[in-house]
Regions:
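Active-site nucleophile elbow and catalytic-triad environment of alpha/beta-hydrolase enzymes
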Residues: 189-206
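A short loop-to-beta-strand scaffold at the N-terminal edge of the catalytic core in hydrolase folds
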Residues: 14-29
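Short beta-strand/loop motif that positions the catalytic acidic residue
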Residues: 210, 216-218
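Catalytic active-site module of serine/aspartate enzymes centered on a nucleophile-bearing elbow/loop
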Residues: 246-276
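Conserved hydrolase catalytic core segment
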Residues: 112-152
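Active-site loop/oxyanion-hole signature of alpha/beta-hydrolase fold enzymes
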Residues: 69-116
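Acidic catalytic loop of the alpha/beta-hydrolase fold
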Residues: 220-225
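Conserved HGGG/HGGXW glycine-rich cap/lid loop of the alpha/beta-hydrolase fold
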Residues: 25-82
C-alpha cells in the first residue's frame, strides 16, 4: 500500500534536517516483498515529492515495484533553506554523496543487501549518476531523465530567462504550492547555475565508473539540454540505452508518461531476466 508523505530527520551540514519522503507500495508483510525492486525517485532542480504528481505511483504499479520519493533539503516540505543560502559548485556531488546516503540510512534502506533502482530527473538525474559512480555495488540500474552531465549554453540561457521580474514572480507563485519556502531554494539553485565558477562543471570522468545498466531519456524539445547530454552517458557507460522522445520537453514524465512507463518496464524486465 502507499503511505502518506512523512518526515525523517538526518544530520547534515552540521544541523538536523527534516526530509519529506513517501513510500509507494511499502512492505505490507507479504512473503517476498522485500525482494521486490525498489525505485528511488530523485526530483529536478526546482522539484519536490509533490511535483512528481502521480507518475511514481503509475510507474511502480505498472512495473510491480516499490517506490521511495524524497524531497531534498530546502525542497517541498523538507526543512527550508535559510534566506540568502548560496551553493558551491559541488552542490550536486554533496547531494549524491552525503544527503542521499544519509536519507537512505535514516529510512532503513540497505542498498548493500538489495541494490537500488534510481530514477532521477534533471538535477536529480545528475545526482543518480554521481551516486551510482561512487557506490556501484549499491545500484541495480539507473533511469535518468533530461540529465545534466556538463553545463551547456542553452541550460544557462534558459535559467537566466527565469530571472526576469515578471517570470520570476509567476514561477515563485507556482512553486509556493509545492514548497514551504520556494524563494531561498530558487535563488540558491539559479545562482549556482548562472555562476562563472560552475560553467566548467562536468561528471564525464565519474560516469566511467558506473557499472549498472542505464536508460537515458531526453526530449527532443528540451530547452534545458541537448541530446549530447545522454549521448555522453552512452560513451561513458557501455550498453546504455538511449530514448529520444518527440513532442517532449524537459520533463519526459509529464510530457510522455506512457512511453516512459513502457520503456522502464522493458528495461527492468531485461535486467531482471539476466539474474539466475
Amino acid at each position: 500500500m502507499t503511505q502518506a508523505p512523512a518526515l525523517v530527520d538526518i544530520q547534515w551540514d552540521g544541523q538536523r534536517i527534516a526530509l519529506e519522503y513517501q513510500w509507494l507500495d511499502a512492505c505490507a508483510g507479504a512473503a517476498g516483498e522485500a525482494l521486490t525492486p525498489l525505485v528511488v525517485f530523485l526530483h529536478e532542480g526546482l522539484g519536490s515529492l509533490a511535483m512528481w504528481k502521480d507518475f511514481p505511483q503509475q510507474l511502480c504499479a505498472a512495473a510491480h515495484c516499490r517506490g521511495l520519493v524524497i524531497s531534498r533539503p530546502g525542497y517541498g516540505q523538507s526543512t527550508p533553506l535559510p534566506a540568502g543560502t548560496r551553493w558551491n559548485s559541488d552542490f550536486l556531488e554533496r547531494q549524491a554523496l552525503e544527503v542521499l546516503p544519509a536519507a537512505l540510512a535514516a529510512l532503513g534502506v540497505d542498498a548493500s543487501a538489495q541494490p537500488l533502482w534510481l530514477l532521477g530527473h534533471s538535477d536529480g538525474a545528475s545526482i543518480a549518476l554521481i551516486y551510482a559512480a561512487a557506490f556501484p555495488a549499491k545500484v541495480a540500474g539507473l533511469v535518468v531523465l533530461a540529465p545534466h552531465c556538463f553545463v551547456e549554453d542553452q541550460t544557462v540561457a534558459s535559467i537566466a530567462a527565469l530571472q526576469a521580474p515578471e517570470v520570476r514572480a509567476a514561477l515563485l507563485a507556482r512553486l509556493a504550492r509545492y514548497h514551504r519556502a520556494p524563494e531561498p531554494v530558487f535563488d540558491a539553485w539559479s545562482s549556482i547555475w548562472l555562476s562563472s565558477a560552475f560553467r566548467h562543471w562536468t561528471i564525464a570522468d565519474r560516469m566511467r565508473r558506473i557499472g549498472c545498466p542505464v536508460l537515458a531519456v531526453q526530449g527532443l524539445d528540451d530547452e534545458y539540454g541537448s541530446l549530447e547530454q545522454i549521448r555522453s552517458i552512452a560513451r561513458a557507460v557501455s550498453g546504455t540505452r538511449l530514448l529520444e522522445l518527440a513532442t517532449c520537453g524537459h520533463s519526459p514524465h509529464r510530457d510522455q508518461p506512457q512511453a516512459l512507463v513502457a520503456a522502464f518496464g522493458s528495461f527492468l524486465n531485461h535486467k531482471e531476466g539476466d539474474n539466475p
